[in-house]
Design a protein with these regions (language model features):
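Cationic, hydrophobic amphipathic alpha-helical membrane-interacting segments
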Residues: 1-114
């Protein structure tokens, strides 16, 4: 089995959950859901939220084992920024993590109770 960097895994997963949060925030602004993000995840439709979480974990695992998650490692990002550069691959990985979270939440978690 390939070694997985826990910091890279956690950062990619956090960025994915940020995408899911962004989707909830968009639905809240449109009036499609009410309440907090916690209510949206746990109270309204917990089975959908569990499915979304499972998909985010699976996508993060795939990103970590393929090496994509290593591109969002905060230590790497800080080192590159201190050198005055940031690789396009890191931008792509950050965007991918965000889109994975937003997309899976959009597909699976259709909305909460109003």
């Amino acid at each position: 089995m390939e070694d997985i960097n826990a910091l890279s895994f956690g950062t990619f997963l956090l960025l994915s959950f940020f995408g899911a949060w962004w989707h909830w925030n968009k639905m809240r602004r449109e009036g499609r859901v009410a309440g907090t993000f916690k209510d949206y995840l746990l109270a309204d439709h917990p089975a959908n939220s569990m499915a979304t979480g499972a998909m985010l974990l699976a996508a993060t695992w795939a990103a970590a084992t393929s090496g994509t998650a290593d591109l969002v490692n905060p230590q790497l990002i800080v080192t590159m920024l201190m050198a005055g550069k940031l690789h396009v691959a890191s931008f792509n990985a950050i965007g991918s993590a965000f889109i994975i979270g937003y997309g899976f939440d959009s597909i699976i978690n259709k909305g909460g109770n109003q």
